[in-house]
Curated annotation (Swiss-Prot):
<keyword id="KW-0456">Lyase</keyword>
<dbReference type="InterPro" id="IPR050477">
    <property type="entry name" value="GrpII_AminoAcid_Decarb"/>
</dbReference>
<dbReference type="GO" id="GO:0015937">
    <property type="term" value="P:coenzyme A biosynthetic process"/>
</dbReference>
<dbReference type="GO" id="GO:0004068">
    <property type="term" value="F:aspartate 1-decarboxylase activity"/>
</dbReference>
<dbReference type="InterPro" id="IPR015421">
    <property type="entry name" value="PyrdxlP-dep_Trfase_major"/>
</dbReference>
<feature type="modified residue" description="N6-(pyridoxal phosphate)lysine">
    <location>
        <position position="232"/>
    </location>
</feature>
<dbReference type="GO" id="GO:0030170">
    <property type="term" value="F:pyridoxal phosphate binding"/>
</dbReference>
<dbReference type="InterPro" id="IPR002129">
    <property type="entry name" value="PyrdxlP-dep_de-COase"/>
</dbReference>
<comment type="similarity">
    <text>Belongs to the group II decarboxylase family. MfnA subfamily.</text>
</comment>
<dbReference type="InterPro" id="IPR021115">
    <property type="entry name" value="Pyridoxal-P_BS"/>
</dbReference>
<dbReference type="GO" id="GO:0019752">
    <property type="term" value="P:carboxylic acid metabolic process"/>
</dbReference>
<dbReference type="InterPro" id="IPR015424">
    <property type="entry name" value="PyrdxlP-dep_Trfase"/>
</dbReference>
<comment type="function">
    <text>Catalyzes the decarboxylation of L-aspartate to produce beta-alanine.</text>
</comment>
<dbReference type="InterPro" id="IPR015422">
    <property type="entry name" value="PyrdxlP-dep_Trfase_small"/>
</dbReference>
<protein>
    <recommendedName>
        <fullName>Probable L-aspartate decarboxylase</fullName>
        <ecNumber>4.1.1.11</ecNumber>
    </recommendedName>
</protein>
<keyword id="KW-0210">Decarboxylase</keyword>
<comment type="pathway">
    <text>Cofactor biosynthesis; coenzyme A biosynthesis.</text>
</comment>
Length: 371
């Protein structure tokens, strides 16, 4: 397609857009079953659209939005049992994970840095390793798909700059034994990063509801940083990932000076320079509106849906669970996986066939419905 010399009427533009986007699945259809993201809350959509011109990459122009981001980090820190945290709302879990690895690398005086992480870790760490020159050391998994902490310890060396634990793996929603990893990290003086991109907006509320889940956050002294994504179970519009550090030194280690911005002497710690302030404002509005109890209701329904679905799988001949769900992710296998996958997709269902099994993520929408 060539760049058009003359424009066309808006009505025609919208018709062409509809022609393309009609091929997309929408969250409002209720047929997307394999995504960790969901239909944004109505309030979040309203706020996002209202403030689309805000740029947190130039906070001197938008001091009010900058203050809102600080309050969001304060609220996320409180949710994660940290009195004072440091961080940003970023483009997503990928950027958040890269920032954590970058901070660990920059603070470590290591010529050949290595990062130990579970074989269940998100592919964003592969990007981080390639971009930052950090060698990834993959730790084995236990039969229940949690990381083998003994194998993590066996792989620690003088080059280890950090350890990663997962609180809600992409494929199975598994929560690693973060308390054991925290103890290990403290014993060896190595920082621990927890990727809770998905679980961060699930586990605190699920634990309050009585679900037996391990601690994963800053309550554990070895945890130095956490990825938490409001645009997943937080019901915020994309893009809205989050990174929270225990100490300011981690943020300082990845900050660079942008002297030409409004106000001068602006330090940036994020990968992206231009950042949508609308995302931050939407997250702030959602947290203030829903509160802990509102999110607890959302998680309650999502967890109940996943348990119901898991029981239905058990009743289905030729299908079986990969493991009992820990969060609101159910993964199962069938004797004819590819045929089942093709049949579901032909009927318009958006599913995720993940490493030999089908993954279903249950979401409770703001009106009590579900995807």
């Amino acid at each position: 397609m060539k760049f058009p010399r003359k424009g066309i009427p808006q009505e025609e533009v919208m018709r062409e857009l509809e022609k393309y986007t009609s091929k997309d699945l929408s969250f409002s259809s209720g047929k997307i079953l394999g995504s960790m993201c969901t239909l944004p809350h109505e309030l979040a959509k309203e706020v996002f659209c209202m403030y689309m011109d805000r740029n947190l990459g130039d906070p001197g122009l938008h001091p009010g939005t900058k203050k809102i981001e600080e309050e969001v980090i304060e609220m996320l820190s409180d949710l994660l049992h940290l009195e004072r945290g440091y961080g940003h709302i970023v483009s997503g879990g990928t950027e958040a994970n890269i920032l954590a690895v970058r901070a660990f690398r920059n603070l470590a005086d290591v010529e050949n840095p290595e990062l130990i992480l579970p074989k269940s870790a998100h592919f964003s760490f592969i990007k981080a390793g390639e971009m930052l020159g950090v060698k990834l050391i993959w730790a084995d998994l236990n039969p229940d798909y949690t990381v083998d902490v003994k194998d993590v310890e066996a792989k620690i060396s003088e080059n280890t700059i950090g350890i990663v634990g997962i609180a809600g793996t992409t494929g199975l929603g598994v929560v690693d034994d973060i308390p054991a990893l925290s103890d290990l990290a403290r014993d060896y003086g190595i920082p621990l990063h927890v990727d809770a991109a998905f679980g961060g907006f699930v586990i605190p509320f699920a634990k309050e509801l009585g679900y037996d889940l391990p601690d994963f956050d800053f309550k554990l002294k070895g945890v130095q940083s956490i990825t938490i994504d409001p645009h997943k179970m937080g019901m915020a519009p994309i893009p809205a990932g989050g990174i929270v550090f225990r100490h300011k030194k981690y943020l300082r280690a990845i900050s660079v000076l942008a002297p030409y911005l409004a106000g001068g002497k602006i330090w940036q710690a994020t990968i992206t320079g231009t950042r949508p302030g609308a995302s931050v404002l939407a997250v702030w509005a959602l947290i203030k509106h829903l509160g802990f109890e509102g999110y607890m209701e959302i998680v309650d329904r999502a967890m109940k849906l996943s348990r119901w679905f898991a029981e239905e799988i058990k009743k289905t001949p030729g299908a079986w669970l990969v493991r009992e769900p820990m969060l609101n992710i159910v993964s199962f296998k069938t004797k004819n996986l590819r045929r089942v996958e093709r049949e579901l997709k032909s009927r318009g269902w958006g599913i995720s066939a993940h490493r030999g099994y089908i993954r279903i993520v249950s979401h409770a929408s703001c009106d009590g419905g579900h995807d």
